[in-house]
Structures are given as C-alpha cells and as structure tokens.
C-alpha cells in the first residue's frame, strides 16, 4: 500500500439509507510532499509520464480524480430519475471537495472509453479535446501512444476564435454532440 492512499467521496441517499455511488481522489500535495514516488503512487502515473514541471508546479496544487462509480439501482439505464439524482449528487460532492481543498487549482484524471463505444465517435471526441485543450506545456506524455487519426474537417466543425473562445467552444461542443449522435453515441 502507498504511504498516501486515495480517499473516497461517498454519495449517500438519506431517504433510502444507502450508498448511491462514489469517487476516488487524492490530494496531490500529500503525494508531492511525501516519501513516495508520484510516478509510482498515482494511478495516472501508470499511463502517463509526468514532466518535472508538472511534479513541481502543478501536482502540489492538484487533485487527481480516480474511478467513479454508481451502484446498479442508480444507473440511468435502470432508473433515469435515480440516475440523474446520482450524477447530480456526485457533482455536488466534487463541489464539496473544491471547497474543502481551497488551495487546489487543478483537477485532473483519466477517462475510460470502452471498446464498444463507436470508433468514429471516439475519434471525434478525442480530436475535440486535443483541439480545444492541447497540452501546450507538455505536462504529461502517454506511456503508450495511441493512434489517433487527424480528421481533415476538424477546423470546420471545431472553430477557435481567440477573441471569443467561449462562444467558439460552445459551437464546437454543439457540433460534437451532433457528430457523435450520427454514430449512435451521446
């Protein structure tokens, strides 16, 4: 076990007296200031090589978000109302973490895209993220580089207006929703 174990955000339904779901997280400051090696101790370290700049300038002010989960009764496919309740309360819990760790400026973590997710839709999502949120500082590098085709019509669907990033991002996000729905994904 690590000297700095992950913590769990637990979402509780007081009316049903049961756990709804949770989120695993770790305070980067405890890892950065600890005896261990962040590259070995953090889940993201198994997938990404951290830069010196990340370890020194970002990790002490970051929360790594790990695996989130929702128990079966609260899955949207089982009960849409309970599914919305679960998601809303997990987001409220993340808000509580923001308030509790007020010196944290960055939240990061990995996202799992299952093989069953349409490959074309996945390529659009990944190109969208890389287009609007590039790692310009080279803070992390994948240990295993994934093949990602660059889509020729990227600029057409995902405009970037440096004078009004918010508006161009919203337009790109709407376009992403349309593109992924064409492949049966949301």
Predicted feature locations:
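Anionic group-transfer/hydrolysis microenvironments
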Residues: 1, 15, 26, 66-69
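A short helix-loop-beta-strand connector motif used in the catalytic cores of GNAT acetyltransferases and
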Residues: 2-9, 33-34
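Residues that flank catalytic or metal-binding motifs in active/ligand-binding sites
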Residues: 5-7, 21, 61
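Extended hydrophobic secondary-structure segments that form protein cores and membrane-embedded regions
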Residues: 8-11, 108-110
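Conserved beta-strand in the GNAT
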Residues: 10, 17-26
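Short, solvent-exposed loop/turn segments that connect beta-strands within catalytic domains
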Residues: 15-18, 77
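Acyl-donor binding region in acyl/amide transferases
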Residues: 30-186
């Amino acid at each position: 076990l690590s000297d700095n174990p992950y913590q769990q955000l637990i979402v509780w339904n007081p009316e049903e007296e049961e756990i709804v779901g949770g989120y695993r997280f770790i305070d980067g400051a405890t890892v950065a200031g600890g005896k261990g090696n962040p590259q070995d101790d953090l889940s993201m370290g198994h997938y990404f090589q951290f830069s010196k700049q990340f370890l020194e300038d970002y990790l002490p002010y970051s929360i790594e978000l790990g695996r989130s989960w929702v128990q079966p009764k609260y899955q949207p496919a089982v009960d849409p109302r309970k599914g919305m309740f679960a998601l809303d309360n997990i987001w409220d819990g993340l808000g509580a973490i923001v308030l509790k760790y007020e010196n944290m400026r960055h939240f990061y973590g990995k996202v799992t895209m299952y093989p069953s997710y349409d490959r074309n839709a996945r390529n659009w999502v990944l190109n969208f993220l890389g287009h609007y949120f590039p790692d310009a500082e080279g803070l992390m590098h994948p240990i295993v580089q994934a093949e990602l085709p660059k889509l020729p019509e990227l600029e057409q669907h995902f405009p970037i207006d440096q004078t009004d990033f918010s508006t161009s991002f919203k337009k790109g996000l709407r376009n992403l929703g349309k593109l992924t729905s064409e492949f049966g994904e949301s």
